[in-house]
Design a protein with these regions (language model features):
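Glycine-rich, Arg-bearing micro-motifs that act as flexible, cationic patches
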Residues: 111-137, 151-155
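Conserved beta-strand positions in the Rossmann-like core of class I SAM-dependent methyltransferases
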Residues: 34, 88, 143
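Structural beta-alpha unit
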Residues: 1, 14, 28, 75-112, ...
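Short, well-ordered secondary-structure micro-motifs
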Residues: 18, 45-48, 101-102, 124-126, ...
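Short secondary-structure boundary segments
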Residues: 37, 115-117, 146-147
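A short acidic, glycine-rich active-site loop
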Residues: 54-71
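Short, flexible loop segments at boundaries between secondary-structure elements
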Residues: 142-150
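Small/aliphatic-rich secondary-structure junction motif
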Residues: 2-55, 83-85, 162-163
Length: 163
């Protein structure tokens, strides 16, 4: 049975569609949702042209992280609030497939949900997609939600039968 679902979002339209889809599914299953936004690392040194090393000051890192957490809670989590679900949100830095798989394992999730394509299309070209990377990082089922998809009663029954 699916009790906990991890949904990854980057704030794009596709990511928000995955959150809305997850909210519909979780409402029908009575599952809790852990929304995860994975941000690129801000803190390590950056080597610039000519070998110059630049650092992002810690206060800038802290403020940026706090602002992002607030945006995640106020904007990205709205479908979860509207559905009346038990949910939590997390903002973590790192590689999206690794972070999502680690969070899913840590919270005991039975399912991971992501959108089809987010804001990092150029990064996907260089490093591979989040959804593909997830399939290499976890043994959990990964649902890739196409833009505009909706949960139907039929898909919910299928999800319950697999549990």
């Amino acid at each position: 049975m699916i009790n906990t679902i991890v949904v990854g979002t980057d704030g794009s339209t596709h990511g928000q569609n995955a959150v809305t889809w997850t909210a519909e599914l979780a409402r029908q299953l009575g599952a809790r949702v852990v929304l995860v936004h994975v941000a690129p690392p801000l803190g390590p040194p950056i080597v610039g042209a000519g070998g110059y090393v630049m650092y992002v000051p810690q206060d800038v890192v802290d403020q940026t992280s706090a602002d992002l957490q607030e945006r995640v809670i106020t904007e990205f989590c709205e479908p979860l609030r509207a559905a009346g679900l038990a949910w939590e949100s997390r903002v973590q830095q790192g590689s999206a497939p690794i972070v999502l798989a680690d969070v899913a394992t840590g919270v005991g999730a039975q399912l991971i949900v992501v959108g089809t394509r987010g804001q990092h299309a150029f990064g996907e070209l260089l490093h591979g997609s989040t959804s593909h990377g997830l399939t290499l990082q976890t043994e959990l089922p990964v649902v890739v939600v196409p833009h505009g998809a909706h949960v139907t009663q039929r898909s919910t029954l299928g999800a319950k039968a697999q549990g």
